[in-house]
Amino acid sequence: MGQKINPLGFRLGTTQSHDSIWFAQPTKYSENIQEDKKIRDWIKNYIQKNRRISSGVEGIGEIKIQKRIDLIQVIIYMGFPKLLIEGKPQKIEELQTNMHKKLNCVNRKLNIAIVKVTNAYKHPNILAEFIAGQLKNRVSFRKAMKKAIELTEQAGTKGVQVQIAGRIDGKEIARVEWIREGRVPLQTIRAKIEYCCYTVRTIYGVLGIKVWIFSK
């Protein structure tokens, strides 16, 4: 059996960079990592609560965190920023003040910025959310996968692979289904591959979605 490494960790330092950038004493590492996890969870929960009900997608591509002694800079890359800020610019300020209180930043400022991702469906997280939404609405998994691949092709990618695992369509025995379009060279380190794994709760149980996108 082939042992599969995470495609993002495999390419760190070549085509991938870290999502969190900060320096700390070795004894403070665990605290900083926990703080990053809390920040990301709070942002996702806040956007889930405040998005428009009609849209089933949160649209978060990635959340980058940069820390200095006196500042925490959080950059949210969103495919559909209108879901959060349309007609409500005070929402970001509200999120900022709530997080500042929860983090207990006494001597540090917290700054949140939202950046729009061009070609949202080039990002695996947004694509996985789209597939999850389709599966929750009981759309056939094959239809959902084909539609997802169409969307990535329109966004101008070189290749995409989608995998769904679990009790697909409510079958009693769990199985794995996958589909690939174009090239996805996982062994080539210099290939820019975006990857994400996403879990979705359906009425039949939990399904795991994995998406690989080869952009350049």
From Swiss-Prot:
Domain KH type-2: 43-118
Predominant place of localization: plastid
InterPro entries named in the record: KH_dom-like_a/b, KH_dom_type_2, KH_sf_prok-type, Ribosomal_S3_C_sf, Ribosomal_uS3_bac-typ, Ribosomal_uS3_C, Ribosomal_uS3_CS
Gene3D superfamilies in alphabetical order: 3.30.300.20, Ribosomal protein S3, C-terminal domain
Compartments where located: Plastid, Chloroplast
Cross-referenced SUPFAM superfamilies: Prokaryotic type KH domain (KH-domain type II) (SSF54814), Ribosomal protein S3 C-terminal domain (SSF54821)
GO cellular component: chloroplast; cytosolic small ribosomal subunit
Any single Pfam family the record assigns to this protein: Ribosomal_S3_C
Family: Belongs to the universal ribosomal protein uS3 family.
UniProt-recorded name of the protein: Small ribosomal subunit protein uS3c
Native source species: Phaseolus angularis
Gene expressing this chain: rps3
